Amino acid sequence: MRNPALVEEMKTYQGRDEVPHDFDAFWDGEIDKVSVLPDYQLDEHDFHIPNVKCYELTFKGTRDGLVYARIVLPKSEKKVPVIFHFHGYMGRCWDWTDMLAFTVAGYGVVSMDVRGQSGYSQDGLRSPLGNTVKGQIIRGAVEGKEQLFYKDVYLDIYQL
């Protein structure tokens, strides 16, 4: 049963903590830093699947990160809607075959490896190559907002 009073309260709920006073200025500044298209490489892969194009994309992320994504698109002269897939903690992007069902329905799919997780993306100079999946979620909690793990993840997504 729906509680109408609770539904109304949820519409204006702001969380348990106040938004920091410099929140908008911080993110405006971070987005300004990535406003130029990054260096990237887009490689097409021919899996001999009719009506589908498959690509691997790598691009330079923030703080010397290297971001990897797979892209699957229906062969079409028209614009198509695109689904962006981001895996959970300690995951990696979808397999090519997992993405194909969406192209049949007319959608493109972009599946990105989050830096420092189990995929091909790299977290720049802050971590060794390979899987560094534990502890990322709290990185920067002591060092400050410029060092936060998810700050760079969000900026990677913005660039994508």
Task: For each feature predicted by the language model, list its residue ranges.
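N-terminal targeting or regulatory segments adjacent to alpha/beta-hydrolase or S9 domains
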Residues: 1-52
